[in-house]
């Protein structure tokens, strides 16, 4: 049987949605018999935008906006084909960006 190490990186603007998605991935992996490390919390990234309210005058009057991006990492150290199939059939919400990185392919 071929075992692989899988890293699943999740990004979202909504932290509650991100935590729910991470929890469903972890429960699915544990039901399939995988050992799970995580979720590992990364620092949130805050991008701030400051815009003048009026076009040419009144420099003191400004509007502030920000976007907060939350990240989580889930690691599956020994994943086989049944675990991968279970994770591929999982339905996640549209607001969550998922990146999967597969490392290795040694026989175990």
From Swiss-Prot:
The record ties this protein, via Gene3D superfamilies, to: Ribosomal protein S10 domain
Q: Any keyword Hydrolase?
A: no
PANTHER family named in the record: 30S RIBOSOMAL PROTEIN S10 FAMILY MEMBER (PTHR11700)
NCBIfam families, sorted:
PRK00596.1, rpsJ_bact
The protein's job, in short, is: Involved in the binding of tRNA to the ribosomes.
Quaternary state and interactors: Part of the 30S ribosomal subunit.
Q: Which HAMAP family match?
A: Ribosomal_uS10
Q: What is this protein called?
A: Small ribosomal subunit protein uS10
Q: Give the originating organism.
A: Ehrlichia chaffeensis (strain ATCC CRL-10679 / Arkansas)
